[in-house]
C-alpha cells in the first residue's frame, strides 16, 4: 500500500514538472497582463510573411504614443538624509 501511494505521488510530481517545463516557452516575450510590445508584434507579423504591417487598433496606438516624462531631480542641499554621528569627534 505504501509503495503504491508513493508511486502515485511520484507520477503526479513528474506530470507537474513536465507541464511546467513544456509551458515555459509561452511566457517568453510577453509583458505583464499577457500583452506583447508593439515592436515584437510587428516583427512576428513580418516573419509570418504577410508582406505588410497590420494597423493597430486605436486603443493600442494611443498607448504607444503616450510616454512617461522623465522627472527632474532637484538638489536643494539639505542634509536631512545624512546619518547622525553616534560619537562626537574629539
From Swiss-Prot:
Sites bearing Glycine amide, chain numbering: 33
UniProt-listed PROSITE patterns: GNRH (PS00473)
Location(s), subcellular: Secreted
Expressing tissues: Brain; ventromedial olfactory bulbs and terminal nerve ganglion.
GO cellular component: a single term: extracellular space
Region Disordered, annotated ranges: 57-90
Biased composition (Basic residues): 80-90
Presence of keyword Secreted: yes
One Gene Ontology term of the molecular function aspect: gonadotropin hormone-releasing hormone activity
Family under the similarity heading: Belongs to the GnRH family.
Function, in words: Stimulates the secretion of gonadotropins.
Protein name per the record: Progonadoliberin-3
UniProt organism field: Verasper moseri
Organism classification: Eukaryota, Metazoa, Chordata, Craniata, Vertebrata
